[in-house]
Amino acid sequence: MIERGKFRSLTLINWNGFFARTFDLDELVTTLSGGNGAGKSTTMAAFVTALIPDLTLLHFRNTTEAGATSGSRDKGLHGKLKAGVCYSMLDTINSRHQRVVVGVRLQQVAGRDRKVDIKPFAIQGLPMSVQPTQLVTETLNERQARVLPLNELKDKLEAMEGVQFKQFNSITDYHSLMFDLGIIARRLRSASDRSKFYRLIEASLYGGISSAITRSLRDYLLPENSGVRKAFQDMEAALRENRMTLEAIRVTQSDRDLFKHLISEATNYVAADYMRHANERRVHLDKALEFRRELHTSRQQLAAEQYKHVDMARELAEHNGAEGDLEADYQAASDHLNLVQTALRQQEKIERYEADLDELQIRLEEQNEVVAEAIERQEENEARAEAAELEVDELKSQLADYQQALDVQQTRAIQYNQAIAALNRAKELCHLPDLTADSAAEWLETFQAKELEATEKMLSLEQKMSMAQTAHSQFEQAYQLVVAINGPLARNEAWDVARELLREGVDQRHLAEQVQPLRMRLSELEQRLREQQEAERLLADFCKRQGKNFDIDELEALHQELEARIASLSDSVSNAREERMALRQEQEQLQSRIQSLMQRAPVWLAAQNSLNQLSEQCGEEFTSSQDVTEYLQQLLEREREAIVERDEVGARKNAVDEEIERLSQPGGSEDQRLNALAERFGGVLLSEIYDDVSLEDAPYFSALYGPSRHAIVVPDLSQVTEHLEGLTDCPEDLYLIEGDPQSFDDSVFSVDELEKAVVVKIADRQWRYSRFPEVPLFGRAARESRIESLHAEREVLSERFATLSFDVQKTQRLHQAFSRFIGSHLAVAFESDPEAEIRQLNSRRVELERALSNHENDNQQQRIQFEQAKEGVTALNRILPRLNLLADDSLADRVDEIRERLDEAQEAARFVQQFGNQLAKLEPIVSVLQSDPEQFEQLKEDYAYSQQMQRDARQQAFALTEVVQRRAHFSYSDSAEMLSGNSDLNEKLRERLEQAEAERTRAREALRGHAAQLSQYNQVLASLKSSYDTKKELLNDLQRELQDIGVRADSGAEERARIRRDELHAQLSNNRSRRNQLEKALTFCEAEMDNLTRKLRKLERDYFEMREQVVTAKAGWCAVMRMVKDNGVERRLHRRELAYLSADDLRSMSDKALGALRLAVADNEHLRDVLRMSEDPKRPERKIQFFVAVYQHLRERIRQDIIRTDDPVEAIEQMEIELSRLTEELTSREQKLAISSRSVANIIRKTIQREQNRIRMLNQGLQNVSFGQVNSVRLNVNVRETHAMLLDVLSEQHEQHQDLFNSNRLTFSEALAKLYQRLNPQIDMGQRTPQTIGEELLDYRNYLEMEVEVNRGSDGWLRAESGALSTGEAIGTGMSILVMVVQSWEDESRRLRGKDISPCRLLFLDEAARLDARSIATLFELCERLQMQLIIAAPENISPEKGTTYKLVRKVFLNTEHVHVVGLRGFAPQLPETLPGTDEAPSQAS
């Protein structure tokens, strides 16, 4: 017999009051006694924590908190621990005698939440001699020890041989190990299972009837019929999948054309782009190689051009330097010519202006005299006109007013006085005291003559003054000329210096006359010198180009050698041209052949693709058209054989399906009529009674009952007789057995068991021998075993049938493919490979291109040598005529000598040119420098004295003139007499007025005419002075300009300057012509270099871009290729025939396919998005992703259970035939999968009956349990009325509700829920879906109601409630219920655990002192009978004679709490007999 596992001990480490304490647990009852706060609850809490380390469930409270929903924040665990590492460990030994230590490491977490950290662990293989406290503590000294952390504990255990340490991160894993090793009774898979286990332990700990358990007894006691539910779920899943597959088939049938279109267009879209990129990659590689070759060639050309450019640039620099000198000389010669011409023009202007000045000087002197005379006459006329005007005014005034006339007389008297005053002034000025008015006229003539004499004398002195001034001016002019030529000097030295300057001027003129001959001689020598230098330069350049120095004597021989080389190179170039033409002709022929092969290649590739596909499909290699036709005949024969085998397998599969359906009938009935007869007779099928028989016993019982194993067991045969009359709907042989279905046994037969057989003695004269069947079908286990084997066989047959069907279809498809191949490609498929020939021709073409390139290089070198030879000959042609110049060494010295002489002559010419005019002017007037006219000042004084005398004479004459004019006023002495004769006076006044006016008019006209004449004279004088001053100033400016020019303006200077300029111009023109030639050549060379540089840069840029593009494309292409190979679509995309299309054709093909695809995937969001992303030309891998997505989409649409292939293209080819076959097969399968409502009702009823029988067996173990007034405890199981009605309708009236169960839109669960709602419209289903309700209705537990009843005193059987029982009675009743639950769990889990393990049983009971002695004894007896361990706690030892008792006393020493523990084993002898009514309990419990 299997021994039950036991808990050996409980170890607490570092708990409150327990530092390191191990409690050895009794095999039955362990009692913890002690006062309040002694540590009993802490000990039990440690046990529970090690058993269920789930902080979400643990809540340790005292009995006053029982049933409360909230408690202290730490759930009672934090306060029971000490600071630091704590342990709680359970030492167990299981049925296999394996020692297992399980436990938890606990540690308080700092914080106000008072949390605790828990780590579960397990130790296996620990020797019995090692105590748990030794593992987790380390002794420091005699009175100190240290608790080991978990990692040190792990290291310590790993060091021990044979010991296994496991730390768990999941409570599920921890409980799974405990279940497998037999420590707990049930596998706790989820938090819900742990919660049930904890509620059971909690109910046991605190005692009483737990409402949490009694309310959900179904979950605790009734096992979940997962097999039935899974069967229904599998059936519904199969039906759902079947219907979905049928729907998919219908959709696939409707989308078949779309599939073809989609795969065709997707292949065209992606393959065209794929091959275009492949072609572009090859083209880019070819371009990159071509760019690299061109780059190398261009670099060589650029280097040659650079060498050529350097040579020409050097020569151009030399010519530029020479041109600069020539330009400077030419510019100087031109400037000199311009200066000479300007000086000549200036000299002509000076001579012309000097003549004009002499003429103006004469005219100016004459005009001065005329103006002086006119001024004198003007003054006289002004005096006369003024006197006449005064006279007229007086007379007019007198005539105007007579009174005024009187006044005039008075005035005349005044005038008389004035006349007397004037006479006196004249006497004084003229020094004539005897002067009278009458003699004044005579004296006036005398003094006028005197005035005229003084005027003549003044004019004579003025003329002398002018002549002296002229002499003084000539001296100053000559003196200034000498100062201008020689510089400042004394006036007395002017004569000597002037003579010296005149002699020096003669010498300088003689030297200046030699300038032109010297200049001509120098020009001739300089020309020869330049030719000599040019010849030397040409020779040096030639030597540099030839890379060797040559003597003058070697040049003629070298000239002949170069001409011979030119002739030979010309012949070589001509021969190379003919060879190049031959190579190019061969290249063109190769190109033409390649083009023709490329046109034939796509047709051949298409034939090869078709041939390769056929070879891949059939696994054969075809070398000729005869092989193809022969294989086609073999294919037809194979197709016929496969069809025959497929039909045979299909028949066997149908037979297996029928047997599975027959064995799957509920209750083991192979005939549905037996179930109806059993219900009609009120009996039970014998197969249902033995439905739980084990697989090992099935052969025995099958042979025992033989043909009667399908009998119906009825309580009374006599009551069945009336039903047998007229019974027709039944099997041919119907067996009826009388017996109690609840307690039926096999005692109805007399049986002798033999080896694999039985002999059944039916009667004294009738025996039956039956062998054990090889495949027993009696009992659920046997049927399930047989069904399982049949399912396996059916799977094999289905797979074989599908394989054969696929082979048939494959063969048919191959036949069609061969037919198409023969019709389309057989003529060209076995021809030679055009691509291989193309590769050979391309290799030859590359060789030709390389030969052409080498030939071009050689020809280029010969051309360069030819050009170099021609340049050498040209250079020698220029050098050879100048050999005599190259031999003249004294030419440079002669040039220097002539240049020095020319410098002296030019210096003399510059002196003559600068001072020639001054010397010419000085030469005629040099004699005036001999004496200096000093009397000029005395003459100026005499002239001033004569002017004063002339003014005095003029005043005297004027005074006498005034006396003469006032001569009439002397007659005013008789003005008194004239007053009496006023009339006569008036006439006289009128006459006098007329005379006076006539005189005034004459005076005015004379004054006006003379004033106009004077004005004209003054204007002429001013004009002459202005002209004279202007021309004088211009003459001075011209003389200064001529001096500034510094050029001698002789007659031959202009001609010499012009000749020199023309010579330099000719030299400059020649130099410029050569320079222009060099510049053009250099510009052409630079342009060629620029073109080569730009070409080189472009080539470098193109090469690097192309290289980068190739590298980038390579990375992208590698990604594309990797994606293509990973997804296995290379065969579809790498269409070699597309490689011969142009990029535009491929792009057009891809664009057309893209347009068609946009329409095709318009309704598919995923494909539409992927297609839109694939349109990016920079991301070719996205097109592959689209193609893969299309394939994946097709794979999803064409399911593998319909079409067994991974290739959608092949699937489309198969689809036409396969879909119709699958439609028929799936339709029949759906009919087979569907389960009837009556079968469901029978299954649920049988399950309910089985569980009722099991509960009844459990009740038998509790019938004699008594606590106080409670005499017995039992579980009452009833079927709910609403659910019972549902079962009745399912079994009897299901035809009325076939609209629900035959609907394709509803699953069976949904139809069951709809039926339940139809039968119970008053029940509110809430928010639950029909599927959820239907799944609940398929669980038999929802059909049952369970409650606990007690037989208490006189009340009889009543519902067990805490309010109707005492505390002790409630504790005992609750403990009984818990024992029942534990036993039920063990029964349920027996099939999940090993057969050799019986799990530990342990419950708790706190505050057990509330039970009386009889109840305590009952508990002890219950533990002994059920082999259960019990831990109880009480203030005192309630039964010291049994079990093991621990006395706990909490003590405080030096602020440290410590629980003192004393253990005591029971000393009572074994009871002589068990409790009344419990003798059969162990057998029943087991």
From Swiss-Prot:
<dbReference type="Pfam" id="PF13558">
    <property type="entry name" value="SbcC_Walker_B"/>
</dbReference>
<feature type="coiled-coil region">
    <location>
        <begin position="1209"/>
        <end position="1266"/>
    </location>
</feature>
<feature type="coiled-coil region">
    <location>
        <begin position="509"/>
        <end position="603"/>
    </location>
</feature>
<feature type="binding site">
    <location>
        <begin position="34"/>
        <end position="41"/>
    </location>
    <ligand>
        <name>ATP</name>
    </ligand>
</feature>
<dbReference type="Pfam" id="PF04310">
    <property type="entry name" value="MukB"/>
</dbReference>
<dbReference type="GO" id="GO:0005524">
    <property type="term" value="F:ATP binding"/>
</dbReference>
<comment type="function">
    <text>Plays a central role in chromosome condensation, segregation and cell cycle progression. Functions as a homodimer, which is essential for chromosome partition. Involved in negative DNA supercoiling in vivo, and by this means organize and compact chromosomes. May achieve or facilitate chromosome segregation by condensation DNA from both sides of a centrally located replisome during cell division.</text>
</comment>
<keyword id="KW-0159">Chromosome partition</keyword>
<dbReference type="GO" id="GO:0009295">
    <property type="term" value="C:nucleoid"/>
</dbReference>
<feature type="coiled-coil region">
    <location>
        <begin position="444"/>
        <end position="480"/>
    </location>
</feature>
<keyword id="KW-0238">DNA-binding</keyword>
<dbReference type="InterPro" id="IPR007406">
    <property type="entry name" value="MukB_N_dom"/>
</dbReference>
<feature type="region of interest" description="Flexible hinge">
    <location>
        <begin position="666"/>
        <end position="783"/>
    </location>
</feature>
<dbReference type="GO" id="GO:0051301">
    <property type="term" value="P:cell division"/>
</dbReference>
<dbReference type="InterPro" id="IPR042501">
    <property type="entry name" value="MukB_hinge_sf"/>
</dbReference>
<comment type="similarity">
    <text>Belongs to the SMC family. MukB subfamily.</text>
</comment>
<keyword id="KW-0131">Cell cycle</keyword>
<keyword id="KW-0067">ATP-binding</keyword>
<dbReference type="Pfam" id="PF16330">
    <property type="entry name" value="MukB_hinge"/>
</dbReference>
<keyword id="KW-0132">Cell division</keyword>
<feature type="coiled-coil region">
    <location>
        <begin position="977"/>
        <end position="1115"/>
    </location>
</feature>
<feature type="coiled-coil region">
    <location>
        <begin position="835"/>
        <end position="923"/>
    </location>
</feature>
<comment type="subunit">
    <text>Homodimerization via its hinge domain. Binds to DNA via its C-terminal region. Interacts, and probably forms a ternary complex, with MukE and MukF via its C-terminal region. The complex formation is stimulated by calcium or magnesium. Interacts with tubulin-related protein FtsZ.</text>
</comment>
<dbReference type="GO" id="GO:0003677">
    <property type="term" value="F:DNA binding"/>
</dbReference>
<dbReference type="InterPro" id="IPR012090">
    <property type="entry name" value="MukB"/>
</dbReference>
<dbReference type="InterPro" id="IPR050308">
    <property type="entry name" value="MukB/SMC"/>
</dbReference>
<keyword id="KW-0963">Cytoplasm</keyword>
<feature type="coiled-coil region">
    <location>
        <begin position="326"/>
        <end position="418"/>
    </location>
</feature>
<dbReference type="InterPro" id="IPR032520">
    <property type="entry name" value="MukB_hinge"/>
</dbReference>
<dbReference type="GO" id="GO:0007059">
    <property type="term" value="P:chromosome segregation"/>
</dbReference>
<dbReference type="GO" id="GO:0006260">
    <property type="term" value="P:DNA replication"/>
</dbReference>
<keyword id="KW-0175">Coiled coil</keyword>
<dbReference type="GO" id="GO:0005737">
    <property type="term" value="C:cytoplasm"/>
</dbReference>
<dbReference type="GO" id="GO:0030261">
    <property type="term" value="P:chromosome condensation"/>
</dbReference>
<keyword id="KW-0226">DNA condensation</keyword>
<keyword id="KW-0547">Nucleotide-binding</keyword>
<dbReference type="InterPro" id="IPR027417">
    <property type="entry name" value="P-loop_NTPase"/>
</dbReference>
<protein>
    <recommendedName>
        <fullName>Chromosome partition protein MukB</fullName>
    </recommendedName>
</protein>
